[in-house]
Structure formats: C-alpha cells, structure tokens
C-alpha cells in the first residue's frame, strides 16, 4: 500500500506506517497535478492537512484511492459525504490538537486583557521616545480571574478551554446544541484530580452573561455571532475565534470594536483565507494569528 502525505507528516507517523509495511511518500504535489500523480503511482491513501483539497472531481478521477485522511479536526477541504458515498474511508484526528488550540485561545486572552497585541506593535516604533505615554495608554488592563468566559461549542476543544479557564479562576458558561452536561476533570502535577460538572445554557444567555466569548464550532452556513448577537453582549466584552472563518461577521465585529462596544478580539481564523480583510488586519484592537491553532510540535506529533 502506498500513502501520499501531501501536506507533510511527522517522523513518528512515518515510522509507524513504515513499520506496518506501508510505503510513505512525502513529495509535495501541486493541487493541479495531484490526480495524475495519484493514478500514476498507485496511491491508495491520501493524507492532507489544510492546504490540499479532496473534492468530488479528484475523488471521481482517482478510482484506486481507498482512504482520505485529514491530519487535524476540520474537514472543510474534503467532500466527506461524497467520498463516503463512493466507498472511501474518510478519517481525521479530532483529539490531537485540542490542547494546542485551547492554549492559543488563552494566548489571545492574556494578551488582550493587557493590550499586548497593540503594545507589541507600538513599542518598537515609539518605545524609546514615548515610553511614558505608552505606559499610560496600556495602564488599564484587567485580570481573567473572577471573569466569566462563554464557550460556544463544548466538544473536545471547548472542554480543554474550560479546563484552563477553571485553573485561572474563571466562571465557565458553555452552550452546545448536542451537549446538556459535561464533566471537566482537572489533572494536577502530583496526580490529584478534580472533576466539575458544567451544564450548558442557551446561547443567548451565554452571550449576555459572558465577559469573554470563544467559539469552537465547525464551519457554518450562517454567522454564529453577527450584529444582533454582538448587540446583546456586555459592553467591553471580548471575543476569540480559533474555530473556523465565517462563524463571526467580521464587518459587524470591526464596527463593534471601533465604537467601543467590544474591547478587543482575538482571531486565528478568518472569513477570507489566505487573504483576510485589510480592515481586520489593520485594526489596533485585534490580536492576530495566521490559523495556527494546531501548529505546535506536540500536536503535530500526535497528529502524525
């Protein structure tokens, strides 16, 4: 059996497959040349991350393909239903990156409440001439402890976010269409464990009660957070999106940031990737990262 890992694979993944007698090819094949390469080299398994797509046309044109694997959680770049209808197995690694994504959420949160996203831009420019002014500008930070975080989508990643939030002394509110209650277990360095039950609430209650909102939902056809939802949020609240682009109305978000309705936003995913809106990129109230939620050495090793 031949496996084409078109978007890369970790050495541990190569070793595991090779030890099982499987040939692993790590050549990066351009999307437009992928069909020919798969057919000419008798590829049975196509492994992708987020760069390579596996759409209907490719599936139809590659009758020898048996498995499509996605290293990561979201499978937006694969026509999953169609592939399965055609008899292919479609697999992913849903738990491998949960901790990494959750930690990135808090990287944005910690940076947001202390204005690091803006001070990191201005200190290199004006730190030597306007130090006291900048110190004054960023002197009204706040703590996360005692604040309420609302988690929209309470699957694996949402629950990892809850663990960190509870460790920070935050109140956790969650909303999920498919989960009523969830047990969150905190594991400590000395082997102790503490388990807490979190009951989910309707999304409107979460929106109205949260100081910070973070989204952990799959791709949606409509905004989860649009102008109407933002209007219901607390004044000065903040929002983080490390889920999928298109779950937040970015136009409404920027308007809310500019008006002062929201204090800051942290975005790892965008409506238009890989060319996010300039207004989003240039906002001095947005903490930015280029869709790197799963991009840690540990997560990539678990993904394979």
Describe each PLM feature range.
Residues 154-155:
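Glycine-rich Rossmann-fold phosphate-binding loop(s) that bind the pyrophosphate
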Residues 86, 94-148:
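Phosphate-binding beta-alpha-beta segment of Rossmann-like dinucleotide-binding domains, i.e.
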Residues 44-45, 67, 212, 238, ...:
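Short, Asp-centered acidic motifs that coordinate Mg2+ and/or phosphate
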Residues 65, 145-148, 227, 236:
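Phosphate-coordination loops involved in phosphoryl transfer and adenosine-cofactor binding
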Residues 275-277, 282-304:
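Adenosine-phosphate binding glycine-rich loop
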């Amino acid at each position: 059996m031949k496996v084409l890992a078109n978007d890369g694979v970790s050495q541990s993944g190569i070793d595991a497959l090779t030890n099982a007698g499987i040939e692993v090819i790590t050549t990066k094949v351009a999307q437009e040349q992928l069909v020919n390469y798969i057919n000419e080299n008798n590829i049975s398994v196509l492994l992708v991350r987020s760069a390579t797509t596996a759409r209907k046309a490719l599936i139809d044109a590659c009758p020898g393909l048996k498995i499509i694997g996605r290293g990561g959680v979201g499978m937006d770049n694969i026509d999953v239903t169609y592939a399965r209808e055609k008899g292919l197995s479609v697999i992913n690694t849903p738990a491998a990156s949960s901790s990494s994504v959750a930690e990135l959420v808090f990287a944005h949160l910690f940076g947001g409440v202390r204005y690091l996203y803006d001070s990191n831009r201005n200190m290199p420019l004006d730190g030597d001439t306007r130090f006291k002014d900048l110190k004054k500008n960023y002197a009204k930070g706040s703590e996360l402890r005692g604040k309420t975080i609302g988690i929209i989508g309470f699957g694996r990643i949402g629950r990892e976010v809850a663990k960190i939030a509870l460790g920070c002394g935050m109140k956790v509110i969650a909303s999920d269409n498919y989960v009523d209650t969830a047990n969150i277990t905190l594991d400590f360095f000395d082997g102790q464990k503490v388990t807490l039950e979190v009951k989910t609430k309707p999304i409107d209650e979460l929106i109205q009660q949260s100081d910070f909102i973070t989204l952990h939902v799959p791709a949606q056809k409509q905004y989860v957070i649009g102008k109407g939802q933002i209007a219901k949020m607390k004044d000065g609240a903040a929002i983080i999106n490390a889920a999928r682009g298109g779950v937040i109305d970015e136009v409404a978000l920027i308007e809310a940031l500019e008006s002062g309705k929201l204090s800051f936003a942290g975005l790892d995913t965008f409506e238009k990737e890989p060319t996010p809106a300039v207004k989003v990129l240039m906002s001095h109230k947005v903490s930015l990262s280029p869709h790197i939620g799963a991009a840690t050495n540990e997560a990539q090793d678990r993904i394979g």
